[in-house]
Amino acid sequence: MLTRTLALVCAASLGAVSSPPAGAQPRTGQQVYESVCAACHAAGVANAPRFGDAKAWKPLIAEGQAALSRTAIRGIRAMPPKGGRPDLTELEVRRAVAYLANAGGARWAEPAK
């Protein structure tokens, strides 16, 4: 119950973050992480793998970039689809996944399209 409550609080707090203007360039993985993902991944809220924690990220990295990106887009356990930000493009989510995974030891290129 606590995990679900924390996830809902994180998702609700993300609604206050502004979206980029229409026609703007897609955000980088770092920009998405800092404005969306850090709310949970910086502190490990609801068992989210912490940013830079190589041990926690190792099995996720082993799943591969495409699989991990699909999971982030669809959501898993306490993490809602797109981290609770439906305004994010799939490209922006994939970029954030690469940024988080790279901080945990992956060597993935940031998706260009």
Predicted segments, located by residue:
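Electrostatic cytochrome c docking/interface patches
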Residues: 15-32, 45-59
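Axial heme c-ligation environment in periplasmic c-type cytochrome domains
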Residues: 50, 71-95, 100-113
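The canonical Cys-X-X-Cys-His
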Residues: 34-43, 96
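Bacterial N-terminal signal peptides
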Residues: 7-17
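Gly/Gly-Pro-rich "capping" loops immediately C-terminal to redox-active cysteine motifs
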Residues: 41-70, 83
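Residue-level recognition of specific faces of alpha-helices
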Residues: 36-39, 56, 78
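Positively charged n-region of N-terminal signal peptides that target proteins for export
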Residues: 1-5
